[in-house]
């Protein structure tokens, strides 16, 4: 059975890069009827942020990436937080010492700094401490770490399913720390032990981990375990081709949610970052992605995360993929956040229908449609000028509107066209000042539709205010 996992660190906001990698892990597991695990790598206590784990899990659920095992859903391989698995790592580090694949190193931070300055990195000097002496010093409580003893000379072969075989000279592989002096493991030890114990068959992660993979391959060899298949995905990039980072881009999934991006659209866009559909189409469901998924269609070029392209896709989902009822339902939290209410479900649906071609994110709806929900809306300078130009015509139009009994789009259009013809002016010379009076803007849906939606009483009240 295919078993995949993601192992985010709770060190900040849920990252768009985590979602991208999660998506491919999820798809590969589902494509093969396998299992998808979420494990929390919280061993870096200095960078740990309270509440970050909950936000990561909530973001995955928001994106529709359900997992079979994890810290909040449990499973047969728990616990799923590395901080709750410390005795395991200590046990396996001891195992490596016994097998001659690791050694204790007692250098102080100051000594290590000096070694780095002189040698450019750790030189393995603690390898020469006789094991009995090292054990005695450890028993006395002398602070130390446990390091991997890389076999030298020699080579280590890494097979990446996307990139082929890479052979590393063991002289280039450092004796990395496996267990820190506080008893916490480093990424290398914890990730290999957990992947093995959790039955992970396919490790799908970002390409920045490729350089660490020879260390992991050596650890599998040291324990006598079969290594999983490795796939290193290209990193998401900024438009300037640098690695995506919060300095240059919005990387927090919480930001996309708050800005009114749809989870379906963001998910679809992230699929396109590393994958192309056989028929070349850009809009597809998660289920369609899973059905079409093969590694042959995964690109290794550095995918550029372009916010404008995502906005375009989000707009396509609002206009063409979701039903009118779904869009109306999803704008509600954004209306409430803007302090706006709606008089009925039918009114809200019609407002969304009119505005649908004009907003690309859910958050833009209350910004652009404010005048449909409140009397407290801004008036643009252009609209104010147009209103002032058209006041004489509006004064004459007002009694006609007041006397109009049939308040429908067709009847109102007939009235306004007839009025413009009678006055010998173009329709726009009447319609634009009236639009400004009713909405505070010159960029709105059709005027007759707005008049009909606002209703006679509210439309007349706004016109009276403009004429006062």
From Swiss-Prot:
GO BP of this protein: glutamyl-tRNA aminoacylation
Alphabetical list of HAMAP family matching this protein: Glu_tRNA_synth_type1 (MF_00022)
InterPro entries in UniProt: aa-tRNA-synth_I_cd-bd (IPR045462), aa-tRNA-synth_I_codon-bd_sub2 (IPR020751), aa-tRNA-synth_I_CS (IPR001412), aa_tRNA-synth_I_cd-bd_sf (IPR008925), Glu-tRNA-ligase_bac/mito (IPR004527), Glu-tRNA-synth_I_codon-bd_sub1 (IPR020752), Glu/Gln-tRNA-synth (IPR000924), Glu/Gln-tRNA-synth_Ib_cat-dom (IPR020058)
Site residues, Interaction with tRNA: 354
Coiled coil (UniProt feature): none
Species of origin: Thermus thermophilus (strain ATCC 27634 / DSM 579 / HB8)
Binding, L-glutamate: 5-7, 41, 187-191, 205
Entry protein name: Glutamate--tRNA ligase
The keyword Ligase is annotated on this UniProt entry: yes
Residue sites binding ATP per the record: 15, 208, 236, 243-247
Interaction with tRNA as annotated region, ranges: 432-447
Catalytic activity: tRNA(Glu) + L-glutamate + ATP = L-glutamyl-tRNA(Glu) + AMP + diphosphate
């Amino acid at each position: 059975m295919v078993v995949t996992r993601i192992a985010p660190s709770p060190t900040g906001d849920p990252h768009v890069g985590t979602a991208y990698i999660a998506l491919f892990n999820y798809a590969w597991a589902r494509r093969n009827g396998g299992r998808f695990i979420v494990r929390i790598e919280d061993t870096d206590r200095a960078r740990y942020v309270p509440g970050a784990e909950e936000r990561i899990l909530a973001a995955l659920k928001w994106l529709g990436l359900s997992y079979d095992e994890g810290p909040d859903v449990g499973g047969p391989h728990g616990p799923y937080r590395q901080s709750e698995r410390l005795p395991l790592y200590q046990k396996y580090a001891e195992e490596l010492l016994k097998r001659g694949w690791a050694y204790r190193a007692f250098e102080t931070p100051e000594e290590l700094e000096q070694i780095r300055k002189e040698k450019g990195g750790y030189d393995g000097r603690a390898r020469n401490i006789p094991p009995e002496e090292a054990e005695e010093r450890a028993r006395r409580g002398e602070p130390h770490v446990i390091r991997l003893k890389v076999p030298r000379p020699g080579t280590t072969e890494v097979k990446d399913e996307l990139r082929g075989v890479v052979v590393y000279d063991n002289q280039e592989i450092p004796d990395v720390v496996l267990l820190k002096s506080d008893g916490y493991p480093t990424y290398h030890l914890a990730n290999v032990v957990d992947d093995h114990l959790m039955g992970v068959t396919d490790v799908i992660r970002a390409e920045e981990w490729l350089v660490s993979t020879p260390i992991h391959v050596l650890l599998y060899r040291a324990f006598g375990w079969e290594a999983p298949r490795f796939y290193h995905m290209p990193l998401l990039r900024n438009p300037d081709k640098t690695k995506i980072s919060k300095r240059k881009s919005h990387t927090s999934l919480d930001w996309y949610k708050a800005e009114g991006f749809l989870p379906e659209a963001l998910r679809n866009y992230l699929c396109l970052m590393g994958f192309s559909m056989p028929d070349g189409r850009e809009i597809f469901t998660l289920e369609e992605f899973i059905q079409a998924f093969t590694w042959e269609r995964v690109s290794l070029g550095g995918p550029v995360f372009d916010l404008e392209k995502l906005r375009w896709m989000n707009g396509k989902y609002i206009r063409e993929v979701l039903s009118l009822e779904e869009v109306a339902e999803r704008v509600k939290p954004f209306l409430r956040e803007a302090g706006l209410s709606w008089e009925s479900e039918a009114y809200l649906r019609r407002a969304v229908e009119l505005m649908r071609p004009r907003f690309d994110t859910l958050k833009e709806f209350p910004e652009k449609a404010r005048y449909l929900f409140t009397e407290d809306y801004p008036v643009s300078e252009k609209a104010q000028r147009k209103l002032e130009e058209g006041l004489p015509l509006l004064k004459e139009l007002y009694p006609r509107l007041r006397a109009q009994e049939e308040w429908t789009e067709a009847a109102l259009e007939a009235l306004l066209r007839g009025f413009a013809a009678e006055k010998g002016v173009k329709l726009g010379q009447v319609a634009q000042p009236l639009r400004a009076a009713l909405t505070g803007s010159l960029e709105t849906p059709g005027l007759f539709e707005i008049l009909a939606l606002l209703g006679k009483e509210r439309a007349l009240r706004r016109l009276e205010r403009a004429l006062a």
